[in-house]
Amino acid sequence: MCEFNVILNGKTQFKDVIYAKAEGGGVTVKNILGEAKEFKGCKIVEVDVSSTTLVLAP
């Protein structure tokens, strides 16, 4: 399985993400433990499987 680290403003904000959904002017992510975090006002700008990063921008 591939888990991603969520990067915002060059810093890791959330780890082990297996789900991401852009909705309502933001992005909701969930990790392997089922914990969720919403990044309001952000959008997904890059997904890199080789470096396991999901990059967000405001």
Question: Where are these predicted regions, by residue range?
Answer:
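Compact, glycine-rich, soluble single-domain proteins
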Residues: 5-8, 13-58
